[in-house]
């Protein structure tokens, strides 16, 4: 089972919406994954053992884990491209 950390400014509303959209997509694709949420500044404390980090905004930090900006899951703009990136990372 894959593990995904979803982070936003406060670790509440936006990350919850992204995590929900992400779970819907992963279920449709038959990819088994769990999500955890946190705020952006807590990523270093919560990223151990994660396979992917999805954030609500850009981050320049390198956590040693693939990190994607998940804003497209909220807006729907270019979300297909993001979903394909997520699928590729989780099925490699």
UniProtKB/Swiss-Prot annotation:
Query: Where is this chain's protein located in or outside the cell?
Result: Cytoplasm
Domain PTS EIIB type-2: start-end pairs: 1-92
Pfam families in UniProt: PTS_IIB (PF02302)
GO biological process terms on file = carbohydrate transport; phosphoenolpyruvate-dependent sugar phosphotransferase system; sorbitol transmembrane transport
UniProt keyword annotations, A-Z = Cytoplasm, Kinase, Phosphotransferase system, Sugar transport, Transferase, Transport
Protein name listed in UniProt: Putative phosphotransferase enzyme IIB component SgcB
Q: Which InterPro entries did the record assign?
A: PTS_EIIB-like_sf (IPR036095), PTS_EIIB_2 (IPR013011), PTS_EIIB_2/3 (IPR003501)
**Any idea which GO molecular function terms this record carries?**
kinase activity; protein-N(PI)-phosphohistidine-sugar phosphotransferase activity
Predominant location: cytoplasm
Write out the function statement from the record. Answer: The phosphoenolpyruvate-dependent sugar phosphotransferase system (sugar PTS), a major carbohydrate active -transport system, catalyzes the phosphorylation of incoming sugar substrates concomitantly with their translocation across the cell membrane.
């Amino acid at each position: 089972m894959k593990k995904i950390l979803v982070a936003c400014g406060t670790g509440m509303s936006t990350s919850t919406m992204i995590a929900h959209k992400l779970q819907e997509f992963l279920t449709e694709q038959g990819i088994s994954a769990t999500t955890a949420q946190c705020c952006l500044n807590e990523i270093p404390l919560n990223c151990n053992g994660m396979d992917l980090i999805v954030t609500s905004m850009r981050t320049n930090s390198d956590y040693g884990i693939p990190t994607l900006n998940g804003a497209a899951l909220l807006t729907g703009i270019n979300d297909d491209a993001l979903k394909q990136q997520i699928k590729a990372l989780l099925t490699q």
